[in-house]
Amino acid sequence: MNQYSEYALIPKKKPFLYRAALNYYSAYHAGLKSFAELYKDLEHYIDDPNRRWNYVLRVKRGITDTSIPGGLYKDQVYLEGAVKILKDRKSINFYALISGKISLEDLKRNFLMKILRLDNLMIPPFMRDMKKFMKGLDRIAKVNFID
């Protein structure tokens, strides 16, 4: 979300989650298609052959036989996480979320909130103005029809 939050505040720009969605699509279809088939399939969405190659390479990296279906699926988790954050943005304690390896589900555990240490927390630059950050998230959610 951090790469979108500043961009979301530029009035003429539209902070679409298309890259995350395209990565999700690529990851899903990597499990169904070979490298060549996925490359051809992505032609519908990505005109530039070099860019298309990079998308396929991203999900097929480390696979020894790219002629068979299979790939890395972590990009599916990224989009799902972004959507969850956008849907729950008004109830999330973002300071607690960035305080360590904490999931959105962990934030719902009362005992955790009691033991978290939020003093001396290193706040990332994009979150220093929480009002501005939330306004950016609101815009990202609106542009992507998430609410």
Please annotate each region the language model reported.
Residues 1-10:
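An active-site-proximal "capping" alpha-helix that borders the catalytic cofactor pocket
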